[in-house]
Amino acid sequence: YKRQVTGGTVFVSRYIAEYYVTKGYDVYVLNRNTKEQSKGVTLIEADRHNLGETLREYRFDTVIDTAYTGDDVELLLNALGDYENYILISSSAVYPEYAPQPFKEYAHLSINKYWGKYGTDKIDAETVLLKRNPNAYILRPPYLYGPMNNVYREAFVFDCALADRKFYLPKAGDMKLQFFHVHDLCRFIDVLLKVKPSQRIFNVGNKEGVSIRKWVELCYAVVGKQATFVEIHQDIEQRNYFSFYEYEYCLDVSLQYELMGDVKSLEQGLEEAYAWYIHNKDKVNRKPLIEYIDNTLC
């Protein structure tokens, strides 16, 4: 198998690349070579916006793309040689916040007031792809987590736990979050390529949401600590002191579960995330959440 992964240096694309290296596949990563490359991959050093004939000679069985925009997709499709399958990792940000929940794959797509341009760019990427290749697969995950996550989400809670800090909770911590482990994302890609379902667009994620309070408790437990909470009921922008917007949403993932009926438990997934984090703290994009708490909320 020859897999091409666009990017391959950060979180999702890096994890996917290493997952297929572990399976013994030929994995080609397409990036500008500004970061350390994973072991076992073959680098195609290029800017995806200026590919020329770089890719023409290759024949890939599958292209896995984390494109952000329609332009990204258009330029890659123009530059590719022969390939069989194309999988785009899109996002739940394509659904407007006012759509009926849980969001179904056929729901109307539009700007989401929390995600803004990120979401509309992903809509463009999907639109361009399906116009050019109606047989491509599109995956719409919720919050992805696990090893290599460079976004300051679970890592923030781990930091609080490691420092024996009280956790500053938005209100009572009842808001639900929906997650999907990056390893389950890879497993589902395998299922798609094996089963080749006629459905082309899939929401992916854990069926069960988790309250913020419970999620924080799990993160602390993984570190070997017990969480104690300070509830924040003031009208403060939640992202100043917490990792997520004050926006609860849920994807309908029943189509995914028909094809792949099991997912990693949050406990196990967070254990894996923590095991990676303690050796890779420098790879996470920290935000000054703890500083804000200490300066403003304490």
Give residue spans per PLM region.
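N-terminal Rossmann NAD(P)H-binding glycine-rich loop of SDR-like oxidoreductase domains
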Residues: 2-23
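Glycine-rich Rossmann NAD(P)(H)-binding loop
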Residues: 6, 146, 170-175, 202-210, ...
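Active-site "gating" loop of Rossmann-like NAD(P)-dependent oxidoreductase/epimerase domains
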Residues: 91-117, 131
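Conserved beta-loop-beta element that borders a ligand/cofactor-binding pocket
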Residues: 126-148
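Alpha-helical substrate-binding/gating segment
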Residues: 158-168, 175-210, 217
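Mid/C-terminal beta-alpha module of Rossmann-like enzyme folds, strongest
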Residues: 191-248, 281, 290, 294-298
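Conserved C-terminal active-site "lid" loop/helix of NAD(P)H-dependent oxidoreductases
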Residues: 237-262, 268, 279-282
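Amphipathic terminal alpha-helices
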Residues: 266-298
